[in-house]
């Protein structure tokens, strides 16, 4: 799915100021992926992006998921794409649709977010 990934992340005082500014600032364009699985009830969306340890920071985790419905997605879909066999190649192709500035900002955002998470 295409999303503005930073819009699904809560800003928290424990985060560095730079990360909080990026969350509130310009859109971080991303092509986020989750699993679609067929269960007895039909097709469901499964997204295991955020660990339960992020609950206290306000992240949308799936701790209470019982296995009979969609999980909470890490970001709000703006555009959905069909399932593909080679996900890595597909994502690489999608990323080429972003401007160089969008790709650079996206990379900086995910690096900054990951660096903060590694301190937790």
Spans of features found by a protein language model:
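His-Asp-centered catalytic microenvironments across diverse enzyme cores
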Residues: 4-120
């Amino acid at each position: 799915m295409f999303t503005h990934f930073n819009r699904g992340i809560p800003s928290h005082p424990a985060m560095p100021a730079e990360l909080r500014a990026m969350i509130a600032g310009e859109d971080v364009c991303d092509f986020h992926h989750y699993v679609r699985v067929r269960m007895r009830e039909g097709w469901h969306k499964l997204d295991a992006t955020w660990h339960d340890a992020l609950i206290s920071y306000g992240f949308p985790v799936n701790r209470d998921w019982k296995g009979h419905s969609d999980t909470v997605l890490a970001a709000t879909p703006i555009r959905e794409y069909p399932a593909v066999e080679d996900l890595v190649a597909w994502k690489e192709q999608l990323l080429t649709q972003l401007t160089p500035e969008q790709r650079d900002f996206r990379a900086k955002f995910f690096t900054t977010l990951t660096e903060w998470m590694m301190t937790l």
